[in-house]
């Protein structure tokens, strides 16, 4: 049985015709890492549409796992205060929890983060400390009820 689960989003490589975001308004944790800030923790990003221009979003960035730059979208584990994950539709739409402990970043935020395409990584750890991971090269949510599309698996779970 797994006792620790983390889910991470990573960006697709920036295309030549895309504008590079200024360092002071990164779109995700990979842009924060690319700007030279390499400490894991809570950071502010500015995800694209459907957010209003300039709306900041607080996220937890993992700068260590698999070369870093991952935007953490969920974390569950053994923390002093356990987060209740039995939420309604609005709870999962908007997100909940404490970014430094257990949380869900929110379906609407994940949708906005993955408009240009994402990869997703799942890290698991059991009670004995045995770890596993699954990495999918293509991940997205649709705007209609957040329908999931995922493909391109590699990993050991």
Predicted regions and their residues:
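Intrinsic-disorder-preferring feature that marks N-terminal prepro/targeting segments
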Residues: 1-12
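Extracellular beta-rich globular recognition domains, centered on the fibrinogen C-terminal
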Residues: 17-157
């Amino acid at each position: 049985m797994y006792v620790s689960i983390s889910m991470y989003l990573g960006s697709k490589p920036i295309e030549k015709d895309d504008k590079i975001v200024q360092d002071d308004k990164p779109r995700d944790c990979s842009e924060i890492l690319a700007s030279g800030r390499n400490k894991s923790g809570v950071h502010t990003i500015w995800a694209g549409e459907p957010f209003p221009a300039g709306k900041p979003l607080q996220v937890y960035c993992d700068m260590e796992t698999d070369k870093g730059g991952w935007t953490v979208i969920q974390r569950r584990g053994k923390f002093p205060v356990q987060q209740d994950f039995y939420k309604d539709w609005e709870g999962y739409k908007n997100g909940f929890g404490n970014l430094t402990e257990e949380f869900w970043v929110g379906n609407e935020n994940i949708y906005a983060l993955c408009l240009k395409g994402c990869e997703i990584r799942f890290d698991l750890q059991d009670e004995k400390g045995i770890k596993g991971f699954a990495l999918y090269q293509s991940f997205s949510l649709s705007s209609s009820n957040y329908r999931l599309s995922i493909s391109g698996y590699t990993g050991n779970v």
